[in-house]
Curated annotation (Swiss-Prot):
Oligomeric and partner information: Part of the 50S ribosomal subunit.
Keyword presence, rRNA-binding: yes
Protein name stated in the entry: Large ribosomal subunit protein uL22
Keyword line: Ribonucleoprotein, Ribosomal protein, RNA-binding, rRNA-binding
Family according to the record: Belongs to the universal ribosomal protein uL22 family.
Amino acid sequence: MLTKREKKELGIGKDQGKAILRYARISPRKVRIVLDLIKGKDIDEAYAILRYTPKAASSILFKLLKSAEANATNNNGLNRDNLYVAEAYADQGPTLKRILPRARGSADRIRKRTSHITLVVKERS
């Protein structure tokens, strides 16, 4: 496993823009539905899909895609017109546990799930 410094010296990751959102208060299952729509698409097409998809994850992913694009163009000097969504995945974060009171003094547990979302954009060659 390489450290951040070693990766920088070797130039690893200079061909991509990456954005990670951690602890997003949305279930990873719901995020994956929208992620599957934009995987492998050109960046402009991905923006259009996210803008017109009526899901809660769409607005979160729109901002994340914007950040990944900015990282690719500003930090790594990639051409915006050739960018596409190379990788997109959502992993499960820690689950917040809450209690819902029920009849006769019992209680149910509510699981409020969180996700770690990663978007990677690369240049098409």
